[in-house]
Amino acid sequence: MQTAPREYSTSGPTAVLAPTTNTQHYAPYSLYRFLSSHKLDLLLGIALLVFLYVITAAPKEVCQVVITGESVVIRNCQQPDRILANLNLSPWNGVKFPLL
């Protein structure tokens, strides 16, 4: 960004440099200029917001199917009867999980 040259007046007994009234005033930065000049800051801010969301998000309960030699346990599932009906349990071919 170019700045206008400043003019100083040196008249008077003390010869103090003071800006004259001929200086140009520039419009404030636009949002686009601000964001384009602060890309790293913007990226770090977004990363911080995503990190905070991941940390504070409530954990979602996962549907679990535990099959042991003794039993089949279905936990936290909305339709356990549908899952149990689709499991192909038989001693001669092992356990097969269908794609639901």
UniProtKB/Swiss-Prot annotation:
<dbReference type="GO" id="GO:0046740">
    <property type="term" value="P:transport of virus in host, cell to cell"/>
</dbReference>
<keyword id="KW-1038">Host endoplasmic reticulum</keyword>
<dbReference type="GO" id="GO:0044167">
    <property type="term" value="C:host cell endoplasmic reticulum membrane"/>
</dbReference>
<feature type="transmembrane region" description="Helical">
    <location>
        <begin position="42"/>
        <end position="59"/>
    </location>
</feature>
<comment type="function">
    <text>Plays a role in viral cell-to-cell propagation, by facilitating genome transport to neighboring plant cells through plasmosdesmata. May induce the formation of granular vesicles derived from the Endoplasmic reticulum, which align on actin filaments.</text>
</comment>
<keyword id="KW-0813">Transport</keyword>
<keyword id="KW-1133">Transmembrane helix</keyword>
<protein>
    <recommendedName>
        <fullName>Movement protein TGBp3</fullName>
    </recommendedName>
</protein>
<dbReference type="Pfam" id="PF02495">
    <property type="entry name" value="TGBp3"/>
</dbReference>
<keyword id="KW-0472">Membrane</keyword>
<keyword id="KW-0812">Transmembrane</keyword>
<keyword id="KW-0916">Viral movement protein</keyword>
<feature type="topological domain" description="Lumenal">
    <location>
        <begin position="1"/>
        <end position="41"/>
    </location>
</feature>
<feature type="topological domain" description="Cytoplasmic">
    <location>
        <begin position="60"/>
        <end position="100"/>
    </location>
</feature>
<comment type="similarity">
    <text>Belongs to the Tymovirales TGBp3 protein family.</text>
</comment>
<keyword id="KW-1043">Host membrane</keyword>
<dbReference type="GO" id="GO:0016020">
    <property type="term" value="C:membrane"/>
</dbReference>
<dbReference type="InterPro" id="IPR003411">
    <property type="entry name" value="TGBp3"/>
</dbReference>
